[in-house]
């Protein structure tokens, strides 16, 4: 089976407030179809997403669609260089508690964010991922910005026993939460996801990233994705968790700007 490459442009996370940019023209139609299918199934999303706008625009074009939080507007399609690019922004008006009935937090984490993530990473079990998110946010709030907190759990992905661990990194200006997933008997084949709990303001520069190319034999086999690892603002992911880290989403305002610029890394997924 021929490998397909998905590109995620980390430069579009935070400034401007785009979720990510996909630059593989062949992948975009399938991806947008998944997003639309999810929206069609989620009636509660109508409170903060105009599903008709999505459906109408998705049928017309999939090129460079941008979803702006709070407004729900889609901007005019544009071509990024000679590549087809799709921009999505996580809508932050929905409360995390609305989705999981998690009363410990008022952080905004929407169903659409879950959908967008899972559209690209289809083999993550719903229950495991949601449990990760719920535990991560709740424990993060309870820890009151402690430097690091580890919470290992057991779960199953595609019938395989796995361990997943939530790690927190906090500084005065930026905070992240990383969730590590790995097979119990293959700890080196580990997949981590990292997302900031506090996002940059619109006039700030991009969240800093660093280039990382996984060593041979230390990556999951399958499709390839280009991504950015967040290492700026004093944040350094735990050495055990730095492999295969993906910057996912921004949830709140950051308290200070960052001057670093992103460079891409790459990750292989099952």
How would you describe each model-predicted region?
Residues 149-154, 200-206:
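Charged, low-complexity intrinsically disordered segments and flexible loops
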Residues 160-166:
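Structural core positions within WD40/WD-like beta-propeller blades
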Residues 151-159, 170, 230:
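Eukaryotic scaffold repeat domains enriched in small/polar residues
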Residues 97-98, 102-155:
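Long amphipathic alpha-helical scaffold segments
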Residues 172-180, 232-239:
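Structural motif
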Residues 1-119, 201-270:
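Acidic, small-residue rich beta-repeat scaffolds with periodic aromatic anchors
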Residues 190-200:
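Solvent-exposed serine/threonine-rich low-complexity stretches and specific carbohydrate-binding patches
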Residues 185-187:
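Solvent-exposed strand-loop boundary residues in beta-sheet-rich modules
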